[in-house]
């Protein structure tokens, strides 16, 4: 996997991608990250990459020419086809399903805008899709690019010490449920004890408990993700039993 990122702040992406799981994946050669600053491709003494918008209004707009030259340099550096993705609040929301789709690509170019945005002509001519982190506005696309790099890199084969870790994450699995609660040492603590079933050694019971917790947690916190009518009989039973337990805890 190769990431090429068009950004005015390539050092930001280099730093964030060098940490933790993603940093280790990069050290293993599971992906490569290349930052490209459009200012390096701007003309004139001031290396200007923005100008005022036609029609007036506040802010500045990123210019076509530096971006076009930057993108051409990326294509010249490696002939491998790349999907060009613009990080934008106008894009489709990023989901785990989209992350899995992107993880199967050999290469992508992440375009990070700044100021009021990018000249629409450049976007129409070069961008394959737009992706958003959510319904809010950031100062630029760099955080969105960092999120995509992190989410995609950890799905590369060998990125995680245990491949099952990714399979058990929130939004994965057959229903895309939220993850279940997790506990570690000590087993007993003033804040509460670890559920007995997790210490029982009964793997079938543990799996059923985790499934139940995922169902209940998804129904409570993200009901938009759960189509209860599509649940099988076993899952419906687990969900109802889990709800009863939650009700008993709330009304002892």
UniProtKB/Swiss-Prot annotation:
Its EC number is 2.1.1.228. S-adenosyl-L-methionine binds at residues 113, 133-138. It catalyses: guanosine(37) in tRNA + S-adenosyl-L-methionine = N(1)-methylguanosine(37) in tRNA + S-adenosyl-L-homocysteine + H(+). GO terms for cellular component: cytosol. CDD domains: TrmD-like (cd18080). It comes from the Bacteria. GO terms for molecular function: tRNA (guanine(37)-N1)-methyltransferase activity. InterPro entries: Alpha/beta_knot_MTases, tRNA_m1G_MeTrfase_C_sf, tRNA_m1G_MeTrfase_TrmD, tRNA_m1G_MTases_N, tRNA_MeTrfase_TRMD/TRM10. Keywords: Cytoplasm, Methyltransferase, S-adenosyl-L-methionine, Transferase, tRNA processing. Pfam families: tRNA_m1G_MT. It is found in: Cytoplasm. Homodimer. Belongs to the RNA methyltransferase TrmD family. Specifically methylates guanosine-37 in various tRNAs. NCBIfam families: PRK00026.1, trmD. This is tRNA (guanine-N(1)-)-methyltransferase. The gene is trmD.
